[in-house]
């Protein structure tokens, strides 16, 4: 039996001009997952693949394409896909769990997180990425356990996708889906269907299926979120509605003034539950992206790589010809002995903590119970982050004439600086 207990939260945000202070598009996401799950930051360069080859995703294989784009991913270390990420063309995607009237199935298929990675690798624009996901959804379906436990935990997915000029919300219920296009203003997602009437695009049988199931009479206005949402929502899904409204209000308060810092402050908001830690779940990783309108200006992606953004540091990553994987945010691998590769799956646990995660955890433990030490560590973290953001601001101001290789080492440098801080704290 699959678990029907949804996680407490997951929140995605996008801000386009005129909601953004500058001409940039801003993307943000908190990944809220089982509290002990580790997320790693993984970089994959662009690649060419043999005709007719396949790619092994978390549970199943799919047909590979000839060319894949370079991607940076924030992902639970046990799976193939990603909770959120970006590609070299400036496309950002985040996914969220959703439960609808369409039942989940027990069989293994593509995880929503697999679809995130596949769309980033294959989608040079947000619109193309929507097409990639819907085509794969139709061919392979979605399903499979989404956490490292023997009891399956299965859900369907919603996605927020954006690029330098526009954004899309893609919401699914089994194989069925609806999409909304956003060209200005701000939008958020919080573990629920939110597309109402007149979707930008939809599954060709979306309405006829609802009619056959008796969810819609075919006469009144077709409202996707009303027709496909569960009539009796679990308690935690009711909490998602409150978070959704809180997210809308936080976006409204920043309307016309949204910056990287204000997006970070939204993702760090504890009162709303957007930055959460309850019921066995917490924010395990966080991401903010800055997407300039001009294709000649590089996009910058800020990643935490550690749990709880209110006690973490955002570090800038930029695609460039010389960028390489940073080992200290990469989890160990276990090959065929990995519990995800054993049948039955997830009968044992392994330690997936990467070096930054370990040192972050150690520093927090060293300060635990000592308010002065906790505040000192937080102020040092904020100072490091302020230096990181100063680099971002400076680079964006000068990037029109800058060589993109100038940012190839910035993520590595920032991770090393953060590691040094935690090691110093943990040794005291």
From Swiss-Prot:
One of its GO terms (biological process) is proteolysis. GO terms for molecular function: cysteine-type exopeptidase activity; dipeptidase activity. InterPro entries: Peptidase_C69. It comes from the Eukaryota. Coiled coil: none annotated. The active site is at residue 10. Belongs to the peptidase C69 family. Secernin subfamily. This is Secernin-2. It comes from Xenopus laevis. The gene is scrn2.
């Amino acid at each position: 039996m699959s678990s029907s207990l949804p996680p407490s939260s997951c929140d995605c945000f996008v801000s386009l001009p005129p909601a953004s202070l500058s001409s940039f598009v801003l993307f943000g996401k908190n990944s809220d997952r089982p509290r002990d799950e580790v997320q790693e930051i993984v970089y994959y360069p662009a690649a060419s693949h043999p005709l007719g080859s396949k790619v092994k995703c978390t549970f199943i294989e799919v047909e590979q394409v000839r060319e894949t784009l370079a991607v940076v991913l924030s992902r639970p270390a046990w799976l193939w896909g990603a909770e959120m990420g970006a590609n070299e063309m400036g496309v950002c995607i985040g996914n969220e769990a959703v439960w609808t009237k369409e039942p989940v199935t027990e069989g293994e298929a593509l995880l929503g997180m697999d679809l995130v990675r596949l769309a980033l690798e294959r989608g040079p624009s947000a619109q193309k990425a929507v097409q990639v996901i819907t085509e794969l959804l139709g061919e392979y379906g979605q399903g499979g356990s989404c956490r490292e436990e023997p009891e399956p935990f299965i859900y369907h997915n919603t996605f927020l996708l954006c690029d330098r000029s526009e954004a899309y919300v893609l919401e699914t219920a089994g194989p069925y889906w609806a999409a909304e296009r956003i060209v200005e203003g701000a939008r958020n997602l919080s573990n629920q269907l939110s597309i109402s009437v007149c979707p930008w695009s939809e599954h060709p049988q979306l309405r006829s299926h609802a009619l056959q199931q008796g969810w819609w009479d075919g006469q009144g206005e077709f409202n996707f979120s009303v027709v496909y949402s569960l009539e009796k929502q679990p308690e935690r899904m009711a909490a998602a509605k409150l978070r959704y409204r809180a997210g809308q209000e936080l976006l409204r308060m920043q309307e016309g003034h949204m910056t990287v810092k204000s997006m970070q402050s939204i993702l760090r908001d504890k009162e709303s539950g957007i930055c959460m830690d309850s019921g066995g779940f917490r924010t395990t990783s966080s991401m903010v992206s800055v997407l300039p309108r001009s294709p000649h200006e590089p996009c910058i992606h800020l990643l935490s790589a550690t749990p709880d953004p209110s006690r973490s540091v955002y570090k800038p990553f930029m695609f460039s010809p010389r960028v390489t994987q940073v080992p200290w945010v990469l989890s160990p691998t276990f090959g065929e002995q990995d519990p995800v590769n054993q049948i039955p799956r997830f009968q044992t646990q392994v330690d997936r903590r990467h070096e930054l995660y370990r040192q972050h955890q150690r520093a927090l433990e060293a300060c635990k119970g000592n308010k002065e030490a906790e505040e000192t560590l937080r102020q040092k973290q904020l100072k490091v982050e302020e230096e990181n953001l100063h680099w971002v601001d400076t680079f964006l101001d000068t990037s029109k004439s800058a060589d993109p290789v100038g940012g190839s080492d910035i993520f590595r440098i920032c991770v090393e600086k953060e590691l040094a801080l935690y090691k110093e704290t943990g040794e005291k």
